[in-house]
């Protein structure tokens, strides 16, 4: 990140130089821990045909910073590339990168569908009925990436960030085959310890409590 925004505790799992060809970047919302323009510039410099899919209201920000091939999406909007459907889905969160732009752009998750498989990334979200709607519209999800961290204190962040228990509820709502916990262990954003989300998720998924154990963490 630049001088604004949180600092990483660990480096990216895959160094920039080792990334394969990138066709599309999907942006869930414009918070600094989800939209890093310098990283996007580096990826675009290595991938001339790169397309960038963003929520409504974020195109101006990216174009102003030199990002090309930007497409805006509202909830349920979709675009097909090479027989792959990209659908922008609702979430319960907010947006803003400064003092005066709060909720000036949209936020959400992304569903990627091929003829054989579906992959869902929830973005940042509190718990809502949106996930039942996603399941109703598109069927059970094969693979989901669900946020589990940045959940304390609940009185303050419950409307915008789910906790590990709610992640399990969303996995059930979506009828996922396999899910992976994300949005933990990379930045210090809220009050819980860095590894607390993973610890709670493991505890909630002991065989005695939850035999199916649908969410995995590295």
Regions of interest found by a model, annotated:
Residues 1-12, 103-123:
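Conserved beta-strand hairpin/beta-sheet module of binuclear metal-dependent hydrolase folds
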Residues 29-34, 93-95, 121, 161, ...:
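Histidine-centered active-site/metal-ligand motif
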Residues 54-117, 200-218:
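Metallo-beta-lactamase
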Residues 1-30, 40-45, 96-100, 128-139:
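Pre-active-site segment of Zn-dependent metallo-hydrolases
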Residues 21-22, 30-36, 61-76, 122:
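Conserved N-terminal glycine/acidic-rich loop preference
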Residues 6-9, 13, 34, 101-104, ...:
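Conserved phosphate-coordination/catalytic loops
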Residues 24, 39, 51-53, 57-60, ...:
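Cap/insert and terminal regions of metallo-dependent hydrolase folds
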């Amino acid at each position: 990140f630049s001088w604004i925004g949180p600092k990483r505790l660990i480096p990216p799992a895959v160094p920039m130089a080792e990334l394969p060809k990138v066709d599309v970047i999907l942006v869930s919302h414009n918070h600094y821990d989800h939209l890093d323009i310098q990283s996007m510039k580096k990826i675009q410099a290595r991938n001339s045909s790169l397309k960038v899919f963003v929520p409504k209201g974020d195109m101006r920000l990216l174009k102003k910073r030199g990002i090309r091939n930007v497409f805006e999406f509202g909830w349920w909007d979709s675009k097909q590339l090479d027989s792959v459907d990209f659908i922008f889905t609702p979430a319960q969160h907010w947006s803003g990168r400064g003092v005066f732009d709060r909720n000036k752009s949209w936020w959400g998750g992304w569903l990627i569908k091929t003829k054989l498989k579906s992959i869902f990334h929830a973005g940042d979200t509190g718990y809502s009925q949106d996930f039942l709607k996603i399941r109703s519209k598109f069927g059970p999800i094969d693979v989901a990436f669900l946020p589990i961290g940045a959940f304390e204190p609940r009185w303050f962040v419950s409307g915008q960030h789910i906790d590990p228990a709610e992640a399990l509820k969303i996995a059930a709502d979506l009828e996922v085959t396999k899910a992976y916990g994300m949005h933990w262990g990379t930045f210090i954003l809220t009050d819980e310890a860095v590894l607390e989300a993973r610890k709670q998720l493991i505890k909630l998924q002991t065989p005695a409590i939850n035999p199916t154990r649908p969410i995995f963490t590295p």
